[in-house]
């Protein structure tokens, strides 16, 4: 059913809006989820006209449109207001424009606000939305905020309090685009729609879980931002722990947003808080030095533009989380994430316990691999007999990949997540309880590192991280399942 809504985007001139938001809204328009009864108000400091704003929107969607006319018709629903987030008069003008558009498009007073700006402006915007009576209790009123949601627990808590002065928790949608990816959402299907997995998805059968977010790129033009953030804040506090919660949660009573969210929150509340000594042993950090991949030489992190040449910011982090629940108590959830690694990819490996062998030789563990990007799909390794006269065993892989046609037809993450917000489905968004629990644990690791309580390991560009990451798993009697650097070295592609 087509949504009736006025969407207001704060930060409408920014890169995210052009690359993600306008194309996602257009796909919703093409699919009929947005039709006649919607309008988009773009706000930013730049003094754009409506005509110029429309041209920006058309340019961002032209490759997706069936015709120029279709793109222009969609863009005609867009309106622009030059806006200073600190100026009350600008909010009064925004309220008047919203009222006019609500009447013109018969949007039934439904409002969606998207804060595509730096978090330090979130509280100011929320305060003015209430004081200038833009949030007036008529129709639905929902707020989407981009990460990062704070830089630690204290800033996140302050930000949350500022938003709660205007919006209820149920109205706030903290977006994490990774949760909009098709295969992450398919984890529910793999787990709960297949008896062979759900019955063994516990500490009795699973030895360890491995989560890898690998990037081949360096920090690129984000050096200034990244040097103040680092891999732990940038990737672990949100993406990694959100993915972990989907893997570790108990089966919800029903497939509803409230039941799913309740089970996810339980995982965050059950995250084991290590002792100080365990923190030093279970979490490592690294920083890339120069290296060569496929004949291309890459500079070290400290040589990147806008990066402190003596920086101690981590570009790689690895560790072991534990969930103190009946289902997974004692099972390590290993993670690693880093820049300038061998190959781009997001993989989850569920490593099952090894069976006692009756064949006189050790058996390889069964491994379920979930491929999230760049390819989507999953594989399951099983032990089988090798072809030949002798009875020799070898692991075989049952492999499935989503074909390009299906992948191309599936919604983009932002499209799916905006669709969810329009339909008041908060399943794939972070509740404050999740954010709170994750920051409290991440803050302890950050504090240890800030006090130089753990070494900063270096690793060569093109590798899969420092040796300490591999040593960490060995301490638990495990090893990383995905090691593309081995093949690259064998092929002479790494130096």
Curated annotation (Swiss-Prot):
Family matches, as SUPFAM superfamilies: Glyceraldehyde-3-phosphate dehydrogenase-like, C-terminal domain, NAD(P)-binding Rossmann-fold domains
Residue numbers binding substrate:
177, 181, 215, 234, 339, 344
Q: Which gene encodes it?
A: zwf
Q: Which domain of life is it from?
A: Bacteria
Q: Which GO terms describe its cellular component?
A: cytosol
Establish whether keyword DNA-binding is in the entry: no
Q: Which UniProt keywords apply?
A: Carbohydrate metabolism, Glucose metabolism, NADP, Oxidoreductase
Annotated NADP(+) binding lies at: 11-18, 45, 84-85, 147
Q: Which Gene3D superfamilies match?
A: Dihydrodipicolinate Reductase, domain 2, NAD(P)-binding Rossmann-like Domain
One biological-process term from Gene Ontology?
Answer: glucose metabolic process
Give the pathway listed in the UniProt entry for this protein: Carbohydrate degradation; pentose phosphate pathway; D-ribulose 5-phosphate from D-glucose 6-phosphate (oxidative stage): step 1/3
The EC designation for this entry is 1.1.1.49
Assigned protein family: Belongs to the glucose-6-phosphate dehydrogenase family.
- Species assigned in the record: Streptococcus pneumoniae serotype 4 (strain ATCC BAA-334 / TIGR4)
Q: Where are the transmembrane segments?
A: none
Q: Where's the active site on this chain?
A: 239 (proton acceptor)
Q: Does the entry feature the keyword Nucleotidyltransferase, yes or no?
A: no
The record's catalysed reaction(s) read:
D-glucose 6-phosphate + NADP(+) = 6-phospho-D-glucono-1,5-lactone + NADPH + H(+)
What does the record give as the function of this protein? Catalyzes the oxidation of glucose 6-phosphate to 6-phosphogluconolactone.
- Upper lineage: Bacteria, Bacillati, Bacillota, Bacilli, Lactobacillales
Q: Which Pfam family is an annotated match for this chain, by its short name?
A: G6PD_N
| UniProt name for this protein | Glucose-6-phosphate 1-dehydrogenase
Class of the enzyme per the UniProt entry, highest EC level: oxidoreductase
Q: Which GO terms describe its molecular function?
A: glucose-6-phosphate dehydrogenase activity; NADP binding
